[in-house]
């Protein structure tokens, strides 16, 4: 409807003249239902351009729109306040929309806005140095839901996980496993480390500085010892220790993601970029363009020419690239694979790094308008208003597995999606553990299960939701309000996809559940005449469809019973 009205308003403005071609027409739902279904502030914004008072412009706009709009879609066009133009939908439009919703069923909400376009969404992208933590969980769920939204709006979506496997972190990981392995293989002196929280831990003397301390390291070392005995003590090669750690940890990571209903289409790694010559190609390309220089034994990128305070190191004095360099190479590979849209989901700690990557891509001739970087803020576990630290066995931090085990996958996903990515998230364990409608995800799932129960009971006593039911019988204000809410679904999904804002969807679904509750409280099904009962059952089925489809987009189950 917004697209239709924008077209009609644009045609009226073209006839008025003196309106800039790039003038954007704004249409929003009024805060109060009595002001109509949609409103535009066009007259207010054009007053200075047209040299007239906004109320007069609004009157002219409304008069001409009344002549243009389809009465089967728009019931009335009204002027309100200082110059707003309000629109009310015709009931035929609502009933036709409801019939379309019911006909589309499980595909309602899908659009072809991105048809013919290929999108790559990169998310999680945690290095395989340990179990996923709670922050990785927010990344995973945000990225996966953005991918779902893009798929629902027509894109051909690829979900990809990138990790650095050629740098210091992986070397320290291998050294950590080796030290634990050597301790299992013989008497190795130990030393005591004091951690940030003042707890202490005994480690072998050969344990590396900043080594990985979790129990999972001991488990990997034990598996190596069980397979090889002490044979690996004779080699200085870290490769078997790194390979064993990477395989074991990635197996755990993939299992964690599956528990959250996340399946990646592919994995990319830093070592492959080196092997393919992509990292060297990036350095050569930036040098040829005159954007690098050597100083103090390091290779620098002239990022100050793009507004940064300091230039950025691309290759350290040791000859080892900084992590930005393979990241640039990875993005060149994305472009060369032909993706029209590339979405990167990063933690807020990347806020200084990703502009350097985009600047390098600009220098290398790539269209960075096709890259969309989503930065998310971090997560704090709280109980009520108090921060909490959950105990954990396998790592010296709270793992994502710990959280899923405590509150469940559906709740975990939903809570990660309740707030805008750029907002710090307090994950309230007390609320998450609540198995009642106080819990926001349970509220939606209860609404879905309640509708299933209502429809089942109605059928048991002889009512049916006849496909030919007369939807025009749905004239109660709560019926009309629910229909309007349901028909917003495709637009809400499109807005969420366009803005890469998954939190739009749970907020909208809460409105649907509330509107259904209001309808059900005031519009009974069992006990009404068959024709009206059938129409109301069709409306209930439509509400069930929207709730289920919305939860599907969020990667959350829609149970028939609770």
Curated annotation (Swiss-Prot):
GO terms for cellular component: cytoplasm. It comes from Salinibacter ruber (strain DSM 13855 / M31). The gene is argS. Pfam families: Arg_tRNA_synt_N, DALR_1, tRNA-synt_1d. GO terms for molecular function: arginine-tRNA ligase activity; ATP binding. Belongs to the class-I aminoacyl-tRNA synthetase family. Keywords: Aminoacyl-tRNA synthetase, ATP-binding, Cytoplasm, Ligase, Nucleotide-binding, Protein biosynthesis. A motif ('HIGH' region) lies at residues 126-136. Its EC number is 6.1.1.19. Monomer. One of its GO terms (biological process) is arginyl-tRNA aminoacylation. This is Arginine--tRNA ligase.
């Amino acid at each position: 409807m917004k697209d239709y009205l924008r077209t009609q308003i644009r045609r009226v403005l073209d006839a008025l003249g003196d309106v800039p071609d790039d003038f954007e027409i704004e249409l929003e739902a009024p805060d109060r239902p009595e002001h109509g279904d949609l409103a535009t502030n066009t007259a207010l914004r054009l007053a200075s351009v047209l040299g007239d008072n906004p109320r007069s412009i609004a009157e002219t706009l409304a008069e001409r729109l009344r002549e243009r709009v389809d009465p089967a879609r728009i019931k009335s066009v009204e002027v309100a306040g200082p110059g707003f133009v309000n629109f009310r939908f015709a009931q035929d439009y609502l009933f036709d929309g409801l019939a379309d919703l019911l006909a589309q069923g499980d595909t309602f909400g899908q659009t072809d806005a991105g048809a013919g376009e290929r999108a790559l969404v990169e998310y999680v992208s945690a290095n395989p140095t340990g179990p996923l933590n709670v922050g990785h969980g927010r990344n995973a769920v945000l990225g996966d839901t953005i991918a779902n939204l893009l798929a629902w709006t027509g894109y051909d979506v690829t979900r990809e996980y990138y990790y650095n496997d050629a740098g210091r972190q992986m070397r320290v990981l291998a050294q950590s496993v080796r030290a634990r392995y050597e301790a299992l293989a013989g008497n190795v002196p130990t030393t005591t480390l004091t951690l940030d929280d003042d707890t202490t831990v005994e480690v072998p003397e050969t344990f590396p500085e900043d080594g990985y301390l979790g129990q999972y390291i001991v488990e990997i070392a034990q598996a190596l010892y069980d397979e090889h005995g002490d044979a690996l003590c004779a080699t200085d090669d870290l490769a078997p220790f790194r390979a064993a750690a990477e395989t074991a940890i990635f197996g755990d990571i993939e299992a964690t993601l599956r528990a959250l209903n996340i399946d990646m289409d592919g994995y990319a790694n830093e070592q492959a970029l080196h092997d393919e010559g992509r990292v060297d190609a990036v350095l050569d390309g930036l040098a040829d363009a005159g954007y690098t220089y050597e100083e103090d034994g390091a290779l620098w990128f002239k990022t100050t020419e793009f507004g940064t305070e300091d230039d950025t190191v691309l290759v350290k004095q040791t000859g080892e690239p900084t992590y930005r360099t393979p990241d640039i190479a990875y993005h060149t590979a994305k472009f060369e694979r032909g993706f029209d849209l590339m979405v990167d989901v990063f933690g807020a700690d990347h806020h200084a790094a990703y502009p350097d990557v985009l600047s390098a891509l600009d220098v290398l001739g790539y269209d960075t308008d096709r890259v969309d970087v989503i930065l998310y803020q971090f997560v704090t576990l709280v109980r009520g208003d108090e921060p909490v630290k959950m105990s954990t066995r396998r790592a010296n931090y709270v793992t994502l597995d710990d959280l899923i085990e405590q509150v469940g996958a559906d709740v975990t996903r939903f809570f990660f999606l309740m707030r805008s990515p750029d907002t710090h998230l307090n994950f309230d364990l007390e609320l998450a553990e609540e198995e009642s409608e106080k819990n926001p995800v349970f509220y939606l799932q209860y609404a879905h299960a309640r509708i299933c129960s209502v429809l089942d009971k109605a059928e048991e006593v002889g009512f049916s939701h006849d496909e030919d039911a007369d939807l025009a019988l749905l004239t109660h204000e709560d019926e009309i309000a629910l229909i309007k809410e349901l028909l917003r679904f495709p637009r809400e999904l499109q807005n969420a996809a366009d803005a890469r804002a998954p939190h739009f969807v749970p907020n909208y679904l809460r409105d649907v559940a509330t509107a259904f509750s209001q309808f059900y409280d005031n519009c009974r099904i069992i006990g009404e005449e068959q024709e009206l009962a059938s129409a109301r059952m069709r409306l209930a089925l439509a509400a069930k469809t929207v709730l289920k489809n919305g939860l599907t987009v969020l990667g959350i189950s829609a149970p028939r019973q609770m």
